[in-house]
Swiss-Prot record:
Domain of life: Bacteria
Protein name per its UniProtKB record: Small ribosomal subunit protein uS3
UniProt cross-references to Gene3D superfamilies, sorted A to Z: 3.30.300.20, Ribosomal protein S3, C-terminal domain
Keyword Ribosomal protein: yes
GO CC aspect terms: cytosolic small ribosomal subunit
């Protein structure tokens, strides 16, 4: 029986960046890795209602820099920045080094696999029919420019006695193409009948040039020299 590799893991260093970008010697590596895990666990719990897409961590010069990608930055920042200051102090206490918190806004949450999966999970917990929730998510993603999307839900769908899986796809989702920019994530819906798992794959297009093309900002076309007006001869 064929199994699917994680779409992010197989594309690391090709078209997908790492979630933690730091180097450490042998003595510090385990502590840093454990610190990253605890920081992410704390932030995901504290910001459960803030539509957090992903958390990236850097460790420059005995400090930690955390970037929170969210569709609702106002909730994370809080009134006059009070909430983000509390988060900074908590992260510094967990990591044991000075912390810096950056907030990055997700412009199109309908094209983010994590936010789409969380949205479907919240709808299922509110007893929305699973087919309606899946179809709505697919239509919104395609309307905003996705090349393809696939949504799969598994569990006691509709309160059925026997668990099953159903999926809905629109467009292309080329999992074997390594240059394809595929966003993948999962979520869980805790219903009265049990846990329903949600998986979302979103194909945003192909990236030619690999990580170098992602790192470089788009170059603006150079202004062409203006031509002299016709019909005027030399004096």
């Amino acid at each position: 029986m064929g199994q699917k590799v994680h779409p992010h893991g197989i594309r690391l260093g090709i078209v997908k960046p790492w979630s933690s970008t730091w180097f450490a010697n042998t003595q510090d590596f385990a502590d840093n890795l454990d610190g990253d895990f605890k920081v992410r666990k704390f932030l995901n719990k504290e910001l459960a209602n803030a539509s957090v897409s992903r958390i990236t961590i850097e460790r420059p010069a005995k400090s930690i820099r955390v970037t929170i990608h969210t569709a609702r930055p106002g909730i994370v920042i809080g009134k006059k920045g009070e909430d983000v200051e509390k988060l900074r102090n908590a992260v510094a206490a967990i990591a044991g080094v000075p912390a810096q918190i950056n907030i990055a806004e997700v412009k199109k949450p309908e094209l983010d696999a994590k936010l789409v999966a969380d949205s479907i999970a919240s709808q299922l917990e509110r007893r929305v029919m699973f087919r309606r929730a899946m179809k709505r998510a697919v239509q919104n993603a395609m309307r905003l420019g996705a090349k393809g999307i696939k949504v799969e839900v598994s569990g006691r769908l509709g309160g059925a006695e026997i668990a099953r899986s159903e999926w809905y796809r629109e467009g292309r989702v080329p999992l074997h193409t390594l240059r394809a920019d595929i966003d993948y994530n999962t979520a869980e819906a805790h219903t009265t009948y049990g846990v329903i798992g949600i998986k979302v794959w979103i194909f945003k297009g192909e990236i030619l040039g690999g990580m170098a093309a992602i790192a470089q900002p788009e170059q603006q076309p150079a202004d062409k020299p203006k031509k002299a007006p016709r019909g005027k001869g030399r004096k």
